[in-house]
Amino acid sequence: LPAPSFSIRVHQNTPDEFLYRACEVTRLGLGVPAMYNDEVIIPALCNRGVSLADARSYCIIGCVEPQCPHKTEGWHDAAFFNIAKVLEITLNNGKVGDKQLGPQTGDMTSFTSIEDIFAAYKKQMEYFVYHLAEADNCVDFAHAERAPLPFLSALVDDCIGRGKSVQEGGAIYNFTGPQAFGVAD
C-alpha cells in the first residue's frame, strides 16, 4: 500500500484542472488520491451535532473516517460487523448450525417474497446491532476506567476544561463506529 495516504476534498467549485490532475494520478492504479465529497460529508457531520464551522474543517483519519481535528474522540474500529453473516442467520431462522444465535424470524422455505426476507433480515439486524452497541458500551466504560489516556486528552479540546479524558467523553465530539463488512463493493 502506498504510504502515507493521500486524499483530496472535492465540491462543486473544485477547479476542473485540479480534478483532471487528480484523475491522472488515480489512473496510475495505486489507490490515491482518495476523494472525499464535501457536499456529502459536511451535512452528515452537522447531522451528528457537529457545528458548521467544525464540519467545514474536517479531515480524514484512519482509512475513511471524517472528524474534526483536535476536537474529536473517534473510536472508528469499535467492532467488525459481518452483515453477510446476519443474512445467513436470517435464512436459517436465527441459527448457525445447531445454535440459536438470533431470534426466530422464519425458515427460508416459508418466505414467499423478497419483502419477507427483508423483514426477517431487518429483525435480525436490529437484534445484533443492539448487542453490538451493548458490547461497545462495555468496552467504552472499561477504556474510561482502565485507560484514560491523559497525554492524548491534553491535546484534545475541552478535555482539561471538562476534567475528563477522551475515554470518558471529554472531547467536544465523541463518536464510536463499527466497521460493516461482508458486502460487495
Residues of each region from the PLM?
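Conserved catalytic cores of very large enzyme subunits
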Residues: 1-185
